[in-house]
Structure formats: structure tokens, C-alpha cells
């Protein structure tokens, strides 16, 4: 029986290294460690490694094989282990794993007390280079914003809208997804809820009216909360307000430090 050729392991003569090569958008079921225990969800993974100039190709099947071997609950410690194992398995000096997924949180309506789920977009990234490891987290939190100028100049009412506040951070110690959500929702004109009754709708409408925020206010207030958390080394806060009186969004961005 003839041996099957291993083309990707052959030598490449163009002398060009590749910064990242691997697989993108692998859908895979995962179990997350959360503040309340665990949560099952479906993630999209991007897994890449550095490829030296002399090597023609990476071993694509090994990325999927690695995930098939691991069913442990995912947290930052497990992401570190996965990233290190991937780099070793692909015989590389650097690699990155990004795991993106919907995260669900049970929320209680402010008046009726009725419970419902709200979803948030989350990405966890682990990166290793020459033995040094770092991780980051990105969370998109939908909230309500109400315009202070509209409130000030109008005899009644004020324009309000849904906003997406996105926090990307690096930290020395693990920061929970729920903690990031709380930092943002506390600073919004009002939180969002999956299910509201009429008394709840009255409450959130009035709460937003009494707590107006420009897009500038939103990013500054969230940034102030994040700076106070000494576990957090660096962050980016973005807010996009989907303006109800315009066909464009208002946008603000703060990077720290």
C-alpha cells in the first residue's frame, strides 16, 4: 500500500510566514461557567496559529480534533489550557482561540416580578505567543437611552431608543460576564427586559425619562465604573444609539489607558 502524501508538511519556498492560519466560525456546543453555576450554549470558534515561512500548510483537522477531545466547562482557566494545547499540537510558537456565543441571563421585571431571559453577545479570546499568555473578553449589552436635550426642550416626552454598549477588556484576574453586564446596565437610562407587564412598562418609561443620557454620558459613566475595578488592566467602551428621530446612529468610544 502506497503512503499517502502529506502535502501541508512539505517545504514552502516563498519565504513568507503567516501570522494566523486555521479555522473560522466552527459552530460547537459549549458549557460555560457562570455566577449561578453553568450554562449550555452554542459557540462560534476561530482557532489560528502562526505558520513559519518554510512550512507549506498547517494541519487543519487538528483544530477540530482538539475541540472534540474537550468537554470541560469553559472558563478563562480552561481557555488558557486549550490555547496552550493547540499551540503545542500544531507545533507553533503562537496561537489564538476566540469563542463567541449568546449568553442568557434571567431577569426580573421591576414591578410585576415576572421572570424572563435576555440575551447578550459575548466573545472570549485566549492568545499565546512565545510562551506568554493573555486573555480578553468582549460583551455587548443592549440598553435604553433617552436624550437629555430632547427632554429639556420638549413640553412633554423625549426621544429614546435602544442602544448597544460594547465593553472589551483585559484583566489580571477573572471578571465575570455578569459583572460587566451590571456595570453597563447600572449606567443606562434604563435596562431592557425580555418580558414586561403594563405596570413594568410604565416603570421603565418613567425611569428612562428621569435618567437621560447622551451617548457621551454613557461611555464616560461606564468607563468610570470599569476604572474603579482594579482587576481590569485595559478596556474599550463603545456605545451606539439607534436614534429614533434619525436614520443614523449616535456613537462614542473610549479606550483606556
From Swiss-Prot:
> Mind telling me which InterPro entries this protein's record contains?
GTP_cyclohydrolase_FolE2 (IPR022838), GTP_cyclohydrolase_FolE2/MptA (IPR003801)
Cysteine pairs forming cystine bridges in this chain are none
- Pathway assignment: Cofactor biosynthesis; 7,8-dihydroneopterin triphosphate biosynthesis; 7,8-dihydroneopterin triphosphate from GTP: step 1/1
Q: Pfam families, per this entry?
A: GCHY-1
Stored NCBIfam families = PRK13674.1-1 (NF010200)
Enzyme class (EC, first level): hydrolase
For this chain, the family text in UniProt reads:
Belongs to the GTP cyclohydrolase IV family.
Q: Which domain of life is it from?
A: Bacteria
Describe the task this protein carries out: Converts GTP to 7,8-dihydroneopterin triphosphate.
Q: Where is this site: May be catalytically important?
A: 147
What Gene3D superfamilies would the database entry show?
Urate Oxidase
**Catalytic activities:** GTP + H2O = 7,8-dihydroneopterin 3'-triphosphate + formate + H(+)
- Organism equals Neisseria gonorrhoeae (strain ATCC 700825 / FA 1090)
Gene field: folE2
One MF term in GO for this entry?
GTP cyclohydrolase I activity
Q: Which GO terms describe its biological process?
A: tetrahydrofolate biosynthetic process
Q: Which UniProt keywords apply?
A: Hydrolase
Write the protein's name: GTP cyclohydrolase FolE2
Keyword check for Nucleotidyltransferase, yes or no.
no
The EC designation for this entry is 3.5.4.16
Amino acid at each position: 500500500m502506497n503512503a499517502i502524501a502529506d502535502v501541508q508538511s512539505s517545504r514552502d519556498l516563498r519565504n513568507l510566514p503567516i501570522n494566523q492560519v486555521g479555522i473560522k466560525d466552527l459552530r460547537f456546543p459549549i458549557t460555560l461557567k457562570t455566577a449561578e453555576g453553568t450554562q449550555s450554549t452554542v459557540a462560534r470558534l476561530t482557532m489560528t496559529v502562526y505558520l513559519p515561512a518554510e512550512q507549506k500548510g498547517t494541519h487543519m483537522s487538528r483544530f477540530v480534533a482538539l475541540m472534540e477531545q474537550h468537554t470541560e466547562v469553559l472558563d478563562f482557566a480552561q481557555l488558557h489550557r486549550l490555547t496552550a494545547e493547540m499551540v503545542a499540537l500544531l507545533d507553533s510558537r503562537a496561537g489564538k482561540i476566540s469563542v463567541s456565543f449568546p449568553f442568557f441571563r434571567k431577569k426580573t421585571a421591576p414591578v410585576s416580578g415576572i421572570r424572563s431571559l435576555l440575551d447578550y453577545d459575548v466573545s472570549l479570546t485566549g492568545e499565546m505567543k512565545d510562551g506568554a499568555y493573555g486573555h480578553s473578553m468582549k460583551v455587548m449589552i443592549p440598553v435604553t437611552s433617552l436624550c437629555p436635550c430632547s427632554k429639556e426642550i420638549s413640553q412633554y416626552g423625549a426621544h429614546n431608543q435602544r442602544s448597544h454598549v460594547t465593553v472589551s477588556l483585559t484583566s489580571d484576574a477573572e471578571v465575570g460576564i455578569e459583572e460587566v453586564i451590571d456595570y453597563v446596565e447600572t449606567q443606562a437610562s434604563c435596562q431592557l427586559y425580555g418580558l414586561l407587564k403594563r405596570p413594568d412598562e410604565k416603570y421603565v418609561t418613567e425611569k428612562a425619562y428621569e435618567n437621560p443620557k447622551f451617548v457621551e454620558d454613557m461611555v464616560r459613566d461606564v468607563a468610570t465604573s470599569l476604572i474603579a475595578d482594579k482587576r481590569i488592566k485595559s478596556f474599550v467602551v463603545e456605545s451606539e444609539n439607534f436614534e429614533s428621530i434619525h436614520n443614523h446612529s449616535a456613537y462614542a468610544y473610549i479606550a483606556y489607558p
